[in-house]
């Protein structure tokens, strides 16, 4: 198994929505979150914008796309907007490696941290990120831009109390 991590090209963006849709199927294991399996995903046009901005990274196995991470600048942090791995490739360390790769890219570009929002108690969400070195941030200490991300999620139907913001400091 040959794993490649690199920036996403515009030509590869068409494959990314299917990866996100597959990744969401894992939420069928949690009845109260099963709706995520059919929730709105990032469009090809949105993926093209992330890639054009240099904010999309791809994980490939034997030259076949299996995962991606898209991000945006949020102050001095690189905010992970979405990390998805095809269901078949989850649990094999590819996501961990992709986060490590993007962390190194972010460090080289001068970002001070990686940030994200995620579910507090879903095993492959906050508990996994904590094992990778991310720390959960208390709502009262959130920087304004990250607080706004949390509020935007709630405005779009996410239950505020079920989610959290996390940060990985880049040294």
Question: How does the language model describe each region?
Answer:
Residues 4-18:
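A short beta-loop-alpha structural element at the N-terminal edge
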Residues 21-46:
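Conserved GNAT-fold acetyl-CoA-binding loop/helix
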Residues 58, 64-72, 79-84:
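Conserved beta-strand in the GNAT
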Residues 83-90, 118-120:
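A short, internal acetyl-CoA/4′-phosphopantetheine-binding micro-motif in the GNAT/acyltransferase core
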Residues 85, 91-104, 131:
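Conserved acetyl-CoA-binding loop-helix of GNAT-fold acetyltransferases
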Residues 106-118:
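Conserved GNAT acetyl-CoA-binding A-motif
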Residues 116-125, 142-147:
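Conserved beta-strand-loop-alpha-helix junction that forms the acyl-donor binding cleft
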Residues 130-138:
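Conserved acetyl-CoA-binding loop of GNAT-fold acetyltransferases
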